[in-house]
Curated annotation (Swiss-Prot):
It comes from the Eukaryota. It is found in: Secreted. The lineage of its organism: Eukaryota, Metazoa, Chordata, Craniata, Vertebrata. GO terms for cellular component: extracellular region. Its main location: secreted. Belongs to the urotensin-2 family. It comes from Cyprinus carpio. Urotensin is found in the teleost caudal neurosecretory system. It has a suggested role in osmoregulation and as a corticotropin-releasing factor. The non-hormonal portion of this precursor may be a urotensin binding protein, urophysin. Transmembrane segments: none annotated. Disulfide bonds join 119-124. This is Prepro-urotensin II-alpha. Residues 109-111 form a propeptide.
């Protein structure tokens, strides 16, 4: 009896942890009581942010393949928050985060041949 209770409690606990890990889908109901300005938040200016720290951050962002942006010297971050620069990098080249289509087994698109009398459907001889 005690074993069944312990087993059911552990299964319940394990299933709840997966539900808690999901992000909130509707953020309109949530209130944000953060600072009103960057000065209150203690934001980091681009001059205070070390170039080596930014390089480490960009290397972590380029997960799939090497980005030529990582080797640039004197990287300047526009604005007050380095997250904006990272977001611009990710939105600029989104194909770097997607693995090549050959790994997914996708086929090439069908291309019609001109003047093919020996064709049946899409198979031409």
């Amino acid at each position: 009896m005690m074993c069944n209770l312990l087993l059911s409690f552990s299964v319940l606990l394990l299933s709840c942890t997966h539900l808690v890990a999901h992000p909130v889908t509707d953020t309109a109901d949530m209130t944000y009581s953060g600072p009103d300005s960057v000065e209150e938040a203690g934001g980091v200016s681009p001059d205070d942010f070390a170039v080596s720290d930014l390089n480490d951050l960009l290397q972590r962002a380029a997960v799939v393949e090497y980005s030529p942006l990582l080797s640039r010297e004197n990287i300047k971050v526009p604005g007050q928050i380095p997250k904006e620069a990272l977001r611009e990098l990710l939105l600029e080249k989104p194909y770097r985060l997607i693995p090549p289509s050959g790994l997914w087994g996708s086929r090439r698109q069908f291309r019609k041949r001109g003047g093919g009398a020996d064709c049946f459907w899409k198979y031409c001889v």
